[in-house]
């Protein structure tokens, strides 16, 4: 459970890092994580035939940047996140470590991005970090290549 809490801490760090004016300082950690929890009923009410909401795109970016940050902490390999989304909610996220692609996910219907619970959020984040870390361990020469 400690690793899950570590991921949630990394996620909160990313959310707060995107707040250049300090508007989120008044919110608790649980309030900042609440938008990441979207129940199945809530998900059904979200239309996918409209433009992507800026807040949803920011949450998606924060999540994958937290995965990259946690991977970097776990392995010491410098990571870079690339998120490409179109206005309709389709796109791709790629996380690199050196020259190694450690995560490559196709995204669709991101208007409905969220998790059923904060535990599921933490578990998904940790699973992605673990998978990326294993790739970096296996291909460490490529992951640490900065040329």
UniProtKB/Swiss-Prot annotation:
It comes from Frankia alni. Disulfide bonds: none annotated. Pfam families: DUF269. This is UPF0460 protein in nifX-nifW intergenic region. Belongs to the UPF0460 family. GO terms for biological process: nitrogen fixation. Keywords: Nitrogen fixation.
């Amino acid at each position: 459970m400690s690793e899950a809490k570590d991921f949630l801490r990394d996620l909160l760090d990313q959310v707060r890092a995107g707040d250049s004016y300090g508007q989120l300082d008044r919110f608790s950690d649980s309030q900042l994580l609440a938008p990441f929890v979207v129940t199945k009923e809530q998900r059904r009410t979200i239309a996918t035939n409209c433009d992507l909401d800026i807040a949803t795109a920011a949450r998606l970016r924060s999540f994958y940047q937290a995965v990259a940050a946690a991977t970097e902490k776990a392995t010491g390999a410098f990571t870079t996140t690339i998120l490409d989304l179109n206005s309709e909610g389709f796109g791709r996220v790629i996380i690199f470590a050196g020259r190694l692609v450690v995560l490559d996910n196709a995204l669709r219907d991101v208007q409905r991005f969220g998790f059923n619970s904060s535990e599921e959020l933490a578990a998904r984040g940790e699973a992605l970090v673990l998978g990326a870390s294993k790739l970096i361990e296996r291909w460490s020469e490529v992951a640490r290549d900065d040329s």
